[in-house]
Amino acid sequence: MTLSRSPPGGPITTPAGILSRTLPALAGALAVGCVVSACGSEGKGPAPVKTCVSQTCIETVNVTDSGNPPDADTGRGAVDHEFAIGAYEITVGQYLGFLNSVARVPTSPATKALWVKPMQDTASYVSAGLIARTGSGTDADPFVYTEIPDIALGASSSRRGILNISWFSAARFANWLQNGATAAASTETGAYTLNGATSGVIARNPGALWWIPTEDEWYKAAYYDPTKPGDNKYWEYPTRSDALPTGEAFPGGVNSANYNAAMPELKKITPTGAYTSSVSHYGTYDQAGLLWEWNDAVYQDFEGVPTTRGLRGGSWSLGMINVSKFGPRDYEPTYDDDDTGFRLATTRK
């Protein structure tokens, strides 16, 4: 999907068959409607399926109902195929295994950039960082990556969402899975032909087995619900609700999320799936909070040159506009801030 960037508040034009919309749609973003518990949708979603590639296991949910219509409000969400998507964002533990497989003796700037120093730094949002790196990165003294645990979370510490992730790091993780998730698995070919690239806009290859979801795939997994009352089968928020989620500490209720600085200082990076009752129709968690998530949308600059990639969802740091279906964002694919993460899509399981 290629989108054209416009001045703030202006229209974003989209391909034929996708409706234009104006952003931000503040009136829609603040609408209050049917809450989950009042709509008969209360409870958890479908159980995830665990898929393991070598030693890396990812829990996914199937997104069915292919050929669904787009959202009447935004024109987003129509998908003509079935697929699976991560029930959760990629975690510290999963990313740690990736680093120790492919980035111990990095041979290119692209591989070295899979880890960035903020991952180990103390900050206002995390007590002591997430992943530490030691060593020199040479054959004689390879890098070793270790989790910096949050003792209070116990075994759930490694399930915290991994952050400071660029689009390129997410794409290399997808390639690694595609190629077997071993130390010998390439990060440069597979779902995406990267060949050392650290800039530019790169399309997904046909036949990908794991990939960064398209804007419509991500959107459908978050908001679509064929059982929703009324004509438009899309909720406004990824918690099966048309009411703004409550930003509060986990586990919360049926319409809660980690966004808008809801968690205490040093404890803002929560385990994925910690809001156990706040779930989409298909069974995804945390699309309303924890981290912004990369998608595969491509945005053009004012001269029509593709420059940026899409992000969606709420984050631990941001407020209500980004939580709703009316709040897409885009950044350069090198962007790797403290509230950017990702989940992957795959073939139906």
Residue ranges and their predicted role:
Residues 69-84, 248-260, 321-335:
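Short, polar loop/linker segments at the starts of domains and inter-domain junctions
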Residues 77, 84-215, 221-248, 300:
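Active-site microenvironments of metalloenzymes and redox enzymes
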Residues 48-73, 81, 199-203, 207-212:
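GGW-centered surface loops in extracellular recognition modules
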Residues 2-3, 32-59:
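Bacterial Sec-dependent N-terminal signal peptides
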Residues 71, 295-305:
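Cytochrome P450 core scaffold surrounding the K-helix E-X-X-R motif
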Residues 199-205, 209, 250-288, 332:
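Short, well-ordered junction/capping motifs at the entry into regular secondary structure
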Residues 1-20:
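N-terminal secretory signal peptides that target proteins for export/translocation
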